Regions:
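Membrane-interface amphipathic segments in extracytoplasmic regions
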Residues: 1-189
Length: 189
């Protein structure tokens, strides 16, 4: 939620959340956050900040602000998850979730381009193996619970409704500019 409480956004991982966070930050402060918006500890109200939770709850209960979320084609979302979270090196210089990638290499035969992610590898074969892993996590909760980056979008979106929220807008990453413009046009700031 913006500090001005003009917009409430339900985050859905791998659905333009960084871009949306930066736009919301800009709408209140006239500048973008210097760094990764996920690392911001001020300038936005976030659910993971205990002091923000009562403000978000009250705003959502009274439906005081424009409330929106963003969804994405499931194939594009899981492909993005694969390249970002499995093949990529994270902001901290390490692999995502520590031992997850080594386990995928061992149990599923996934290749990720070597320790630095820069070596050539069969991306199609590895992605197909990753899909088997993602299916196993979703269907059987093995070898782990589904990760937020590839669990169903509907689960993320529905938690807001179940907890009393109501969306004014749902935009699509595939039509991001158009959808975000509608959100900004409808928001008071």
């Amino acid at each position: 939620m913006t500090e001005s409480e003009s917009m409430v956004y339900r985050v859905v991982p791998k659905c333009a959340c960084s871009s949306i966070g930066q736009i919301m930050f800009y709408s209140d402060h006239g500048r973008y956050f210097d760094g990764d918006i996920h690392d911001a500890t001020s300038g936005l109200h976030k659910w993971n900040q205990p002091e923000s939770q009562p403000l978000i709850e009250a705003n959502v209960a009274a439906h005081k602000a424009l409330t929106f979320t963003c969804v994405r084609n499931p194939y594009a979302r899981i492909l993005s998850s694969f390249f970002d979270k499995i093949c990529g090196i994270q902001r901290n210089g390490r692999r995502y979730r520590g031992n997850l990638v080594p386990m995928l290499v061992q149990k599923y035969g996934i290749e990720v381009g070597g320790p630095d992610g820069k070596q050539p590898f069969d991306q199609i074969a590895s992605f197909r193996r990753f899909l088997l892993f993602a299916r196993d996590t979703i269907r059987w909760r093995r070898p782990m619970e589904p990760d937020i980056h590839w669990s169903a979008v509907s689960g993320h979106v529905a938690t807001f409704i179940v907890n009393g929220g109501r969306y004014d807008q749902i935009l699509f990453t595939e039509k991001f500019d158009e959808g975000m413009q509608k959100v900004l046009d409808a928001a008071p700031t």
